[in-house]
């Protein structure tokens, strides 16, 4: 019986190992910011076993006050398991408190250039990703939700799909919050900069026939709920295809832990429809 018990325990251990991928920390160089930026890359467990297989990638952006460890260590601790189940690489960069802009008033912040160009090039060079916007998506929560749509809408040649969870999709009602005035200047003195750095105004630039696949989610008790509703209504008026979900919930990690599951499935369907989940 003891031998059988040991064999059973060993089998369970092997199953547990097989069910999870691995997480690699990298330092991605940024010429724009003259520094290296940390990122965590979450790989499926099949990554090392099949050297001929390439994978689609989802970029996950953290919120204000977070860093590159926030997604896998706090918001979605089983991200490595999902990477294995779905056959997807997740990339979690450190976005500081940048709102993922190239900040006009803070020249050392060029996170739009970093994430949309430098980081993607680094990941594609060093990992077996499918190197196509049809195999690349970006999303995030709060500040990262703003970043997901900001970068996804503005860089459709890089990201074929984008999303937001509880995103600050219109920053203008919050002129004194989250260090935005450090990047944009005071709203009262720089209204045109604030107007040109908010996601809701980027919607006017979208060609409905070329719009990225887009998914937006916000809880009804979230302080960003009204601006997300406004963005949804504007996208409807502009006939821009998107998926919009709202349900009971507040601005908290428990909400995003659940919301990201739906967004991952949305992106997975996008990848499959684009025939990208295959070998290059």
Locations of regions flagged by a protein language model:
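Bacterial N-terminal signal peptides that target proteins for export
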Residues: 1-8
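Bacterial N-terminal signal peptides
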Residues: 8-16
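Non-catalytic cap/lid and distal C-terminal segments of serine-dependent acyl enzymes
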Residues: 20-280
